[in-house]
Every structure is written in structure tokens, then in C-alpha cells.
Design a protein with these regions (language model features):
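N-terminal intrinsically disordered/low-complexity leader segments
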Residues: 1-24, 214-218
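Amphipathic C-terminal alpha-helical segment
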Residues: 111-115, 131-134, 159, 179-197, ...
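Hydrophobic alpha-helical connector segments
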Residues: 74, 88-121, 172-179
Length: 218
């Protein structure tokens, strides 16, 4: 779950409203589209699926959002803006890097299994397969969204080095990738039905190796 989504290219820009005022709630329609994309993915979601979920006709969809691609890009941003706080709030306020990583993963265990709100399981960004079927710009948008997790982790671990909590010899790049991979794996397991308790146990096992990975050996 992220909240930084760069926009690139024409497909990332929603159409500007023109003509008669809309006869539907655009925000509510976007929320419905986001949920549908989250559950089914971009490729498996058809325009008819979207119009049914959003309660509008296809002309209204195109007038309000421009295209399916532009709607998906906006849905990704909406997803991040609405849901990122579930996993990042405690991370950002944690006093130590260890506490930050633990909070990120534990809060992910709750959020990814729908335990903090009535949300679909898994992470919309992690589970997205868009980009390999002729939608290069959307693929780049998704990759950039995924990169946010790594960048935040690497920055926080770097601060841990500055604070003396993590050894200067520690490979914080590799450690950030490791934590990112753990969280991504949790998303897949959550989508497959793993419980919050199972994911929390996974986090505890992950953190058992913290000292080995962050301190000088010998």
C-alpha cells in the first residue's frame, strides 16, 4: 500500500468534464472501480464489469475518466491515498529502525487480511500484473508505486546506521529488499487465504534474524 503515484503520459490524465453536469457521484464511482480493480486486476476487468460496479454507462465512464487505462491510474492513486496510513503511520513514528520494520510488517498483516477495514485481501499494487500486455505506461506507474516501499525502507535503515542502531557494515540495500520481499509475499499469502495470525507469526520469524543482519559479526 503506497501513497506516492507519479503520473506519466496521456493515459494517466482523466478527461476533463464538459457539457452537462454529471448525474452521478464521481468519487463513489472511483471507489467502486478501485475495489473492482483490486479484486480482479486490470486485465480481467472489462468495461462492462466497471460500468456495472460503478452504476454508470460506458459514455459516462469515458467522459469522466477518459479511458480504462486512465481510470486504473486514478484508481491506483486513490488506493494509495486512502489506504497507505494503515501500514505506514506506525512505521513513520517509530523510534528505532527495528520498531519501524516490525510495525510495517505487523500492520501489513492486519491490513492485508482485511482486519482493519472492510477491504479486499492483499495489496492492489503488489498483486497488479499490468504492464506486460501492451500497457507500458501503466506498468511503469505500478513499478514506481512498488519502489516507494523500498525507498522508504532503505532511508529508514540508513537513519538507523546514522543513529548507531545498525552497523555501518550492514548491507541496508539488501536488507530493504528483503523486507520488501517479505511484505510482498505476505500480500500473496493473504490473497490466498492466510490469516492475520499466520502472517504475524511470519513477521516474528523474520525479525528473529534482525541482529544477525544489522550488527557486526565477530
Amino acid at each position: 500500500m503506497q501513497n506516492d503515484y507519479p503520473t506519466t503520459g496521456a493515459v494517466m490524465t482523466a478527461a476533463r468534464p464538459r457539457g452537462r453536469p454529471r448525474a452521478f457521484d464521481r468519487d463513489a464511482a472511483l471507489e467502486s472501480a478501485t475495489r473492482l480493480f483490486w479484486i480482479k486486476g486490470f486485465g480481467a476487468t472489462s468495461i462492462s464489469d466497471l460500468t456495472e460496479a460503478m452504476g454508470i454507462g460506458s459514455p459516462s465512464l469515458y467522459a469522466a475518466f477518459g479511458s480504462k487505462e486512465a481510470l486504473y491510474a486514478e484508481a491506483l492513486r486513490h488506493y494509495g491515498e486512502k489506504n497507505a496510513h494503515f501500514i505506514w503511520s506506525a512505521f513513520q513514528s517509530a523510534e528505532t529502525a527495528r520498531d519501524a520494520v516490525t510495525s510495517l510488517l505487523m500492520d501489513s498483516a492486519a491490513a492485508l487480511t482485511g482486519c482493519v477495514a472492510d477491504l479486499p485481501r492483499g495489496c492492489m499494487v503488489t498483486l497488479s500484473a499490468v504492464g506486460g500486455e501492451g500497457h507500458a505506461e501503466l506498468g511503469e506507474l505500478v513499478r514506481r508505486a512498488r519502489a516507494v516501499t523500498f525507498e522508504r525502507l532503505e532511508a529508514r535503515l540508513g537513519q538507523g546506521v546514522v543513529d548507531g542502531e545498525i552497523a555501518t557494515s550492514a548491507d541496508i540495500h539488501a536488507l530493504a529488499r528483503f523486507v520488501q520481499a517479505v511484505q510482498a509475499g505476505m500480500s500473496i499469502l493473504a490473497r490466498d487465504g492466510a490469516s492475520r495470525a499466520e502472517l504475524e507469526d511470519m513477521v516474528r520469524v523474520t525479525m528473529l534474524g534482525w541482529d544477525t543482519r544489522t550488527q557486526d559479526v565477530g
